[in-house]
Amino acid sequence: MKIDIREAISSKLPKASRWIPGFVYRWLARLIRQDELNRVLCENRGKTGSAFAEGALHTLGVSVSVMGEENIPASGRFVFVSNHPLGGLDGIGLIAFLGKRYGDDHLRFLVNDVLMAVKPLDNVFLPINKYGSQSRESMRAVDAAYAGDFQIGTFPAGLCSREGRDGRVRDLEWKKSFVAKSVETHRDVIPVYFSGLNSRFFYKFAKFRKKLGIKFNIELILLPGEMVKNRGSKFEIRVGKPIPWTTFTSARRSGEWAEIVKDKVYDMADEQ
């Protein structure tokens, strides 16, 4: 597998791509750090799933320490829910951690369907359409995963964290589906906090896009480059105690429960 931004655009927009000047392709290649990403792919050729995730972290010189793994029960089916600070390395770090613990055959991670293009990880991915109607086939696959014996990993925000008006970097609203599914399939929820930040430029760009009234999150194109910018970094995963599925009663709406779990995850950042 090799990343080629010109080829990717040509396959998606064959007519429009003919009119895009060569310097634009070269600029985009530099923006997403195409050469450095291809180095990660090259050095981990032949690896898939958690083995690829571990290899990618090693190539980038990234270390991820885990605290609280003892909070995970020895048996059971769980939904691991995490904040989404980075939009790349956090997912890779969690796949490396959970894949090592459970094995790739017993892990499925809910992701934006565009990430299915990352072939070395598609064996643990469960695609969700974030920008269109969810196909019946995709919905059935998600339902089957929850009903089965897989451990499920998800970033309920769907998008990586943004900077708020108060200057704090936090996830946007958490989607309620993990609450409904945990109740439906009797799965306890395990809260996970992942440390880390993207660059100041990323957050400023996101704010500027919003000021312009552009709804589509065009800053997504910056995320591959953000991953490379974080090379050599040290991150931390904090695992909390399971939240029984019976906690999510009708006393509150599923959306309210989702925000309560989200607050719990951020509280874990300050726990010693």
Q: Could you tell me what each predicted segment is?
A:
Residues 1-78, 89-93, 104, 122:
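Membrane-anchoring hydrophobic helices of lipid-metabolizing enzymes
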Residues 5, 136-272:
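Non-catalytic C-terminal accessory region of glycerolipid acyltransferases
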Residues 35-36, 78-133:
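Catalytic core of membrane glycerolipid acyltransferases/transacylases, capturing the structured
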Residues 58, 103, 229-233:
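A short, structural micro-pattern
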Residues 62-69, 110-113, 136-142:
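Short, charged beta->alpha transition segments
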Residues 71, 114-116, 132, 196, ...:
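Residue-level detector of flexible, active-site-proximal loop/helix-junction positions
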